């Protein structure tokens, strides 16, 4: 029972946002939003989620995780209930922000319920599964989306999300976790830390989301947001550095071992953008809509599930790096395969094998990564756990945002480059180009009698094909870049394994000599 409740709660934490993300184009049309405006809807979810992680650990210590989750769920249900009747853009932003805030305690609560279902002997396998099941919400959302969303009436979706929150609340109240020791840990200074860091992280999220839309060099707003983010974050860390009982252990942030872990965790999350950004947006650029992704995300769902099961079954405290190395190798191979396959004829079915491998890799590395981070943290003290939770959450949230922002920027630049390159190769006097234009013009003549207009339409059709081919080449470029990063991580992992083996052999040799 604990296992079923834990899985349900963990998946529900991200399911609603996943469905909204899958249907952003429809929501944009529903509320008549610009691309910049609609991008704020998933952005505020991440902002609130990062902010909630600042409060979560101490809230669990002082009030209990169940109490914190119940209050968060009640607030979310209230806002969701209002949203059923008041469907507008500001309310959509408020609901997504509340959803992001609630998702943080729900994912932790789901983890604890799953772990409670395992005996102490297999508790760490429960940790692997508890962390992994929350990721299943994204593919599940895309699979369910066509059956829940009606562009003429969004009430069904909002009612469904309200029902999920209600079910989670009922489960938490009916089946309680064992009581944990509660201690007074909050200080008044924690409020100032939160007021500095939460908006700082929020502004940074906003910059990453809006950068490739408003364009980095063209919008003064992005500059002001970035300056504000840096000022708030630096002030927050400076304030924490000189506190007697800091929320964040700033001195630990300077250690080499921690930064090696942070960079590795960040890059592991970034290379998963090959799936979440590159392949999905390539297929969208070919005209596919959300209902045509059901089979694609079904494959991803089972890939994640398979990776989760294999990760739990092959668990070993002494061998945490090998699963991550295997994961990077799978992503590198899948990226090379995808980059060399892109054409205008490609459909989701062509990506099933590679994306199953990427999804498998994503679940395979998560458990060992978390366990490695906790081991690094507990070597310091329990007081360092909050710092780890914030850092790990930041690597995963910002890794995804940076991946999307970086690849989106690169895709736009490479599209323009390839478009200019194709146009330079196409001379207007070229017989092939002339013949193609004549074919297009002949196709328009039955509906357009004016010769000049039919010529313009023919030229426009040719330009659309040029743009499409340039986009295909650009997506191939960003997937190739992703393969380079994955290959670097694979090499880094192999070096670490070899180094560890070398040190162990030297220690064994020294013991034999003595």
Region locations from a protein language model:
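Helix-loop-helix hairpins in multi-pass membrane proteins, especially solute transporters
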Residues: 53-192
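Extracellular/periplasmic helix-loop-helix junction of adjacent transmembrane segments
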Residues: 23-51, 91
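Interfacial helix-cap and linker-helix signal at transmembrane-aqueous boundaries
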Residues: 27-29, 59-60, 92, 114, ...
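MFS transmembrane alpha-helix packing/gate-lining sites
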Residues: 16, 45-52, 102, 133-138, ...
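Hydrophobic transmembrane-helix bundles of small-molecule transporters
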Residues: 146, 150-264, 268, 275
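12-transmembrane solute porter fold
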Residues: 2-16, 21-22, 35, 245-415
């Amino acid at each position: 029972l604990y296992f079923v409740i834990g899985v349900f709660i963990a998946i529900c934490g991200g399911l609603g946002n996943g469905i909204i993300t899958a249907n952003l184009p429809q929501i944009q049309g529903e509320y008549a939003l610009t691309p910049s405006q609609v991008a704020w809807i998933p952005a505020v979810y991440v902002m609130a989620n990062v902010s909630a992680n600042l409060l979560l650990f101490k809230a669990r210590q002082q009030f209990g995780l169940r109490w914190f989750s119940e209050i968060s769920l009640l607030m979310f249900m209230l806002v969701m209930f209002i949203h059923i009747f008041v469907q507008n853009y500001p309310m959509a932003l408020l609901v997504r922000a509340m959803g992001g805030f609630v998702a943080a305690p729900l994912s932790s609560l789901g983890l604890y319920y799953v772990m409670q279902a395992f005996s102490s002997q297999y508790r760490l396998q429960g940790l692997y599964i508890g962390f992994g099941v929350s990721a299943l919400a994204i593919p599940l959302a895309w699979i369910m989306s066509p059956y829940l969303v009606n562009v003429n009436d969004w009430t069904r979706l909002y009612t469904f999300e309200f029902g999920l929150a209600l079910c989670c609340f009922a489960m938490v109240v009916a089946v309680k976790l064992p009581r944990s020791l509660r201690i007074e840990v909050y200080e008044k200074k924690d409020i100032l830390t939160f007021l500095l860091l939460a908006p700082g992280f929020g502004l940074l999220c906003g910059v990453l989301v809006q950068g490739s839309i408003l364009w980095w060099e063209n919008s003064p707003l992005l500059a002001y947001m970035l300056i504000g983010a840096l000022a708030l974050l630096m002030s927050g860390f400076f304030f924490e550095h000189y506190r007697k009982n800091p929320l964040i252990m700033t001195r630990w942030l300077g250690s080499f071992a921690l930064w090696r872990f942070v960079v590795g965790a960040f890059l592991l999350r970034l290379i998963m953008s090959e799936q979440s950004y590159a392949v999905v947006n390539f297929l969208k650029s070919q005209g596919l809509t959300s209902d045509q992704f059901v089979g694609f995300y079904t494959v991803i769902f089972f890939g994640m599930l398979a990776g989760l099961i294999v990760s739990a079954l092959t668990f070993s405290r002494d061998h945490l790096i090998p699963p991550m190395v295997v994961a990077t190798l799978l992503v590198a191979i899948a990226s090379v395969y995808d980059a060399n396959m892109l054409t205008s004829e490609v459909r989701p079915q062509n990506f099933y094998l590679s994306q199953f491998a990427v999804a498998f890799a994503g679940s395979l590395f998560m458990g060992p990564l978390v366990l490695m981070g906790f081991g690094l943290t507990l070597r310091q003290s329990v007081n360092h756990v909050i710092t780890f939770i914030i850092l790990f959450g930041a690597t995963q949230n910002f890794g995804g945002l940076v991946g999307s922002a970086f690849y989106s920027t690169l895709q736009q630049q490479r599209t323009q480059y390839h478009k200019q390159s194709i146009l330079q190769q196409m001379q207007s006097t070229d017989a092939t180009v002339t013949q193609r234009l004549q074919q297009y013009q002949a196709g328009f003549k039955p509906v357009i009698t004016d010769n000049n207009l039919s010529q313009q339409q023919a030229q426009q059709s040719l330009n659309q094909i040029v743009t499409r081919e340039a986009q295909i080449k650009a997506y191939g470029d960003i997937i190739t870049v992703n393969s380079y990063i994955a290959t670097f991580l694979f090499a880094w992992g192999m070096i670490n394994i070899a180094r560890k083996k070398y040190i162990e052999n030297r220690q064994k040799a020294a013991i034999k000599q003595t």
